[in-house]
C-alpha cells in the first residue's frame, strides 16, 4: 500500500507559521528550529491520532508509522498516557 505525500493544508499552515516566526525574529538568528517545530506539532498530532484510533495504541502507532513503545514514550512525555 503506497501512501501519497501531498503538500496540502498542513504544509501550508506550517509554512505560514514559520514565515511569521522569521518575521518576528527581527534580525535575530533562529536556533534549534527543527526541535521547536516538532515540539509544537507533536502534542496535537498525538491527540488527533489517538482520538481517531479510539485510544488504541497499536492502531495509532501503525497510523504514525512508529513502534508502539515509541508511541507510549511520547504519550507519557506529553502526559497523555
Task: State what each model feature region is.
Residues 2-11, 16, 23-81:
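Bacterial C-terminal helix-turn-helix
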Amino acid at each position: 500500500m503506497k501512501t501519497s505525500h501531498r503538500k496540502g493544508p498542513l504544509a501550508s499552515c506550517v509554512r505560514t507559521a514559520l514565515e511569521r516566526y522569521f518575521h518576528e525574529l527581527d534580525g535575530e538568528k533562529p536556533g534549534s528550529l527543527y526541535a521547536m517545530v516538532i515540539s509544537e506539532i507533536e502534542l496535537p498530532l498525538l491527540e488527533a491520532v489517538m482520538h481517531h484510533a479510539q485510544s488504541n495504541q497499536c492502531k495509532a502507532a501503525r497510523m504514525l508509522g512508529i513502534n508502539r513503545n515509541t508511541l507510549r514514550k511520547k504519550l507519557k512525555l506529553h502526559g497523555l498516557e
